[in-house]
């Protein structure tokens, strides 16, 4: 088992560090908008690319490698140092290039990311194939999702190079939604549906409903992309209804599976189930945004803060909650496998680490959830109060405080888990 840079744990810890640092940048830009003194726009793009590539994409890669290691597929393989370096160079190039508005840096970062896609995709597919619910339809579903990742990188390169200025708006829409809708959102839904039942030690409540979700979700996503490309709100709303019904079916199926498993509770399951709740909020909010623009002028004013609220319902409420759930599940098991060679002694050490990760889980999940809801509340308040209102500023600082509290708490628990070694005889695996 590999140790150091290139190991699954290194992907997870480095990805979490990227996410923390870029989250601070994002909160600073949000506060700047609310206070009427926006920070340079380059910082916003640094936040976006750093969080998505250095943070979320690296964490997803780490979770895939962790899954392979935990089922014994990676015990005799060397570390993934090349992928680790390439992914972090890609994040650094994209983030710094976005901040400095340097297209050459962005293109270099995009090239590193493009070169990392093949090994990254292979590990993700191999990891999900270990799930009992893997089917040919799941393989097709994941292939479509990974195509979205490839597409967003290629379209991002076209944008950075400014090679097709006439198509800039269309390319930008494709770049955004191929990555966010096809890869992150759709891929995460499929991953949760495949991974949650084994975590609960229970088969999926309805296999047929699960297959319907895998079939309809790409169709709804394709319809939504078509609506965006054609600037047709009616197509967007029709596709949105399809997505809402499909996602509701997925959530019902997973919640029923959890209920049949005896409603087990851990910080991992808490975050994953909360992510499902925000998944529905995200879709309903998107439908409301689409309905709002049917009026001319829009029925309710819609500006930068409202866009931030909508997108971060997805980023923090759904994606981050799900990734944190995976992180809380993987870290104790990785450390136990890495540090204890004895099969008899390993469970006791793993339970000790799980106890650390489960501490104050209600506070951790609640702070992250209510902090996200607070971001939605802030722009809603601007419909009735000015930005200078004490109501708005109170909601802003409360939301920021809750989010920072949750992130800080999780970081402290990860640090404590990494720093807790097994008592007695132990051996580190190389």
Stretches with model-predicted labels:
Residues 1-430:
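Hydrophobic alpha-helical transmembrane segments of multi-pass integral membrane proteins
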């Amino acid at each position: 088992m590999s140790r150091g840079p290139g190991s699954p744990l290194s992907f997870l810890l480095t990805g979490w560090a990227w996410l923390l640092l870029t989250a601070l940048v994002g909160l600073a830009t949000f506060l700047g908008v609310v206070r009427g003194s926006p920070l340079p726009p380059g910082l916003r793009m640094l936040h976006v690319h750093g969080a998505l590539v250095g943070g979320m994409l690296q964490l997803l890669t780490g979770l895939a490698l962790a899954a392979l290691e935990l089922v014994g597929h990676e015990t005799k393989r060397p570390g993934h140092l090349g992928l680790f370096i390439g992914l972090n160079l890609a994040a650094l190039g994209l983030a710094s290039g976005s901040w400095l508005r340097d297209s050459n840096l962005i293109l270099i970062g995009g090239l590193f990311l493009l070169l990392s896609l093949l090994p990254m995709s292979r590990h993700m597919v191999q990891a999900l194939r270990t799930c009992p619910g893997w089917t040919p339809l799941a393989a097709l579903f994941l292939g479509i999702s990974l195509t979205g990742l490839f597409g967003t990188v290629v379209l991002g390169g076209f944008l950075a190079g400014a090679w097709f200025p006439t198509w800039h708006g269309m390319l930008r829409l494709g770049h955004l939604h191929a990555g966010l809708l096809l890869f992150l959102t759709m891929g995460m839904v499929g991953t949760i549906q495949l991974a949650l039942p084994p975590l609960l030690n229970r088969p999926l409540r309805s296999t047929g409903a699960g297959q319907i979700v895998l079939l309809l979700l790409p169709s709804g996503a394709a319809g939504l992309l078509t609506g965006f490309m054609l600037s047709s709100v009616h197509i967007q709303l029709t596709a949105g209804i399809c997505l809402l019904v499909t996602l509701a079916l997925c959530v019902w199926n997973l919640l029923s599976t959890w209920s049949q498993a005896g409603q087990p509770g851990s910080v991992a399951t808490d975050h994953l189930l909360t992510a499902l709740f925000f998944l529905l909020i995200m879709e309903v909010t998107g439908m409301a945004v689409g309905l709002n623009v049917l009026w001319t002028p829009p029925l309710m004013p819609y500006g930068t803060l409202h866009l931030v609220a909508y997108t971060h319902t997805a980023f923090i409420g759904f994606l981050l909650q799900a990734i944190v759930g995976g992180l809380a599940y993987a870290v104790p098991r990785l450390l136990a496998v890495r540090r204890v060679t004895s099969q008899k002694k390993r469970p006791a050490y793993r339970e000790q680490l799980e106890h650390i990760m489960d501490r104050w889980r209600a506070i951790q999940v609640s702070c992250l959830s209510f902090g996200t809801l607070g971001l939605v509340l802030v722009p809603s308040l601007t419909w009735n109060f000015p930005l200078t209102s004490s109501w708005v500023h109170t909601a802003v600082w409360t939301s920021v405080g809750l989010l920072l509290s949750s992130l800080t708490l999780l970081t402290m628990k990860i640090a404590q888990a990494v720093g807790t070694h097994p008592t007695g005889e132990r051996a580190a695996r190389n």
